[in-house]
């Protein structure tokens, strides 16, 4: 998993999203991806909300301070010690949401704040079946935003979208 993420490079979809986000001061990316590829494609961290966290660093479960992942993993693997936060003593783990762990409250609040202010909401490459994130398009429509869904397969929200494109992401953005 670690090696896959290290070797991964942004694809045409990541680059197109970066172009969209960077062309509009108020644009914001809400992502479930944990691979840092949006940042690698050029989207500033300040314009990204990572709902499921990020697999490229670690953070304290209590105070949420970030740590470089390499040294944290090394201590755990070499010594079998669960790393603790230098600030508050809390447990440090990879900054992703694990099964059974609740969604990050701050990330969800930021996402909802961005959604209620948007006039266009685009979903790209998601089946829209896992909640609470799957409810974001409906929230956007309820506040009056236009909704675009780009996904290879149909979703349960296609009927409320203003535009639906059932194609591979690379095909949709091939000329961007």
Feature annotation, model-predicted:
Residues 1-176:
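Conserved catalytic alpha/beta core of Sir2/sirtuin-type deacylases, generalized to analogous enzyme cores
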């Amino acid at each position: 998993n670690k090696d896959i993420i290290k070797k991964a490079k942004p694809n045409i979809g990541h680059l197109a999203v970066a172009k969209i986000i960077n062309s509009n001061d108020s644009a914001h990316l809400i992502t479930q991806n944990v691979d840092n590829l949006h940042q690698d494609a050029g989207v500033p961290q300040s314009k990204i909300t990572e709902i499921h966290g990020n697999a490229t660093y670690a953070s304290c479960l209590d105070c949420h301070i970030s740590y470089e992942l390499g040294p944290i993993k090394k201590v755990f693997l070499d010594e079998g010690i669960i790393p603790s936060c230098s600030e508050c003593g809390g447990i440090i783990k990879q900054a992703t949401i694990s099964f059974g762990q609740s969604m990050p409250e701050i990330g969800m609040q930021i996402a909802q704040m961005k959604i209620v202010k948007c006039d266009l909401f685009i979903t790209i490459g998601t089946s829209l079946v896992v909640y609470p994130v799957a409810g974001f398009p409906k929230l956007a429509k309820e506040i009056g935003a236009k909704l675009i869904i780009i996904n290879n397969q149909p979703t349960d929200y296609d009927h409320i979208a203003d535009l639906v494109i059932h194609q591979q992401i690379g095909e949709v953005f091939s000329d961007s």
